[in-house]
């Protein structure tokens, strides 16, 4: 049986090369053709990257480590740096903001207003190695996920979440520790890759 597809393709390596993503095939970089990326020049790609359909990336600096997955319908926005460490994941419809308007009413809001009339907060967002962000979660400017931190679905991250914790809620709070078994799996994967190269 033939599988019929509509808008199910990732950009070709030639298309990625034209956007300035060098050696995309050997680095295993996949960007879906329906993703909206405002400026490819502001993205640093590691290896083994996958950006799924209908994701919108409109941020000043995006740093993606190795083995990073940005799932369907995610949004990454802002003028401060957003960085995702090795083996980090943001699940479907997750949102990351490195900039936010002032909601107090003391200034005007939105990008149609000249900057002199707004009071936008810009703060770097750092997602450490082995972090997992659950579906429909939101990270606000200045959020820091230390290594191994996991965020449950539909949570709101404000500030720092400790390493190897599982946090949930609005705002997200740690509820228990997370196992570190994935560190052993990372070493096994590294050895497996070396064996493949022999």
Regions found by a protein language model. Name each.
Residues 11-13, 33-45, 50-141, 170, ...:
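Flexible, glycine/small-residue-enriched loop-and-beta-strand segment within the central core
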Residues 164-167, 171-188:
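Conserved beta-strand-loop-alpha-helix hinge in the C-terminal portion
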